[in-house]
Amino acid sequence: MRNYELTTITRVSSREVTKSEVQDTLNKFSVSVTADEDWGQRKLWHPIKHEEQGIFHHYKCSAEPSAIEKVEKEFLINQNILRSMVVRLDG
């Protein structure tokens, strides 16, 4: 298992629904979340999918690389997730 940081930007209009969808996706692929930070609502530098603001959420987690690939694909399909970024941590 490797350690990752995962950041998502979600639609303001579906804050709670999207948060539970993200948690369900992580659980579905056996991603172990070690830390969970809500960075709150922020103005976006430029509109993403016609949205001017987004909810930023940051996770520290550990998982197999294949599970992270599947999570990223699920996030691309989800219309409520505007952007996501996964970074592998050293060690």
Swiss-Prot record:
The residues the entry assigns to the signal sequence are none
**Under the GO molecular function aspect, what terms does this record hold?**
rRNA binding; structural constituent of ribosome
Q: Name one GO biological process term.
A: translation
Q: Which InterPro entries match?
A: Ribosomal_bS6 (IPR000529), Ribosomal_bS6_sf (IPR035980), Ribosomal_S6_plastid/chlpt (IPR020814), Transl_elong_EF1B/ribsomal_bS6 (IPR014717)
Q: Which domain of life is it from?
A: Bacteria
Q: What Pfam families does UniProt report for this protein, alphabetically?
A: Ribosomal_S6 (PF01250)
For this record, an example GO cellular component is: ribosome
Query: What job does this protein perform?
Result: Binds together with bS18 to 16S ribosomal RNA.
Descriptive protein name: Small ribosomal subunit protein bS6
